[in-house]
A protein has these predicted regions:
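N-terminal amphipathic, basic helical "cap/leader" segment at the start of enzyme domains
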Residues: 1-72, 79, 83
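Small-aliphatic-rich amphipathic alpha-helix that forms the alpha element of a beta-alpha
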Residues: 31, 74, 89-132
Length: 155
């Protein structure tokens, strides 16, 4: 328990070592397994590895260096239409944010157990990424998660 909750720190400078496809799949499963409002599948988790896409995420994150340094970025977004089938404002937007945050936290905890480092990035220009990734207007990007290994573990 200590490893997950007390030893975790945000990393901003990662090694170039890639996160394996197997581990990426595990992290996606863990994120999608997170509790959600009404049990409705309203979260999308998109892995980003291309330099071009990472540069746009870097710009949208107010130039947070962890985004460029990490070999893997997850874009966590919520679908207002999906959740809107059951909930309406003033609750809908806050529920989407909560669901994305819980999914992201699940992934962060899993990374910690797997000796993978993370940097949670909540300060983002969502609209910029939404336009870049050509998402519909009811999809809201909530967080980015930079994922990778410590520089000292590079091999």
């Amino acid at each position: 328990m200590e490893k997950v909750f007390f030893e975790r720190k945000s990393f901003r400078e990662f090694s170039e070592k890639k996160v394996s496809s197997e581990l990426q799949d595990i992290l996606l499963k863990v994120g999608y397994a997170a509790p959600r409002s009404g049990g409705i599948p309203c979260i999308t988790i998109t892995p980003i590895t291309s330099d071009k896409d990472k540069k746009m995420c870097y710009k949208a994150s107010f130039y947070q260096k962890a985004v460029l340094s990490a070999p893997l970025i997850y874009v966590i977004s919520g679908d207002l239409d999906m959740l809107g089938k059951k909930y309406k404002e003033p609750y809908l937007t806050s529920f989407i944010i909560q669901n994305a945050a819980v999914a992201t936290m699940n992934m962060i905890n899993a990374c910690q157990l797997l000796n993978i480092e993370t940097c949670y990035i909540g300060g983002i220009r969502s609209e910029m990424l939404q336009k870049y990734f050509e998402m519909n207007e009811t999809t809201k990007i909530i967080t980015l998660l930079a994922v990778g290994y410590k520089r000292s573990e590079e091999g």
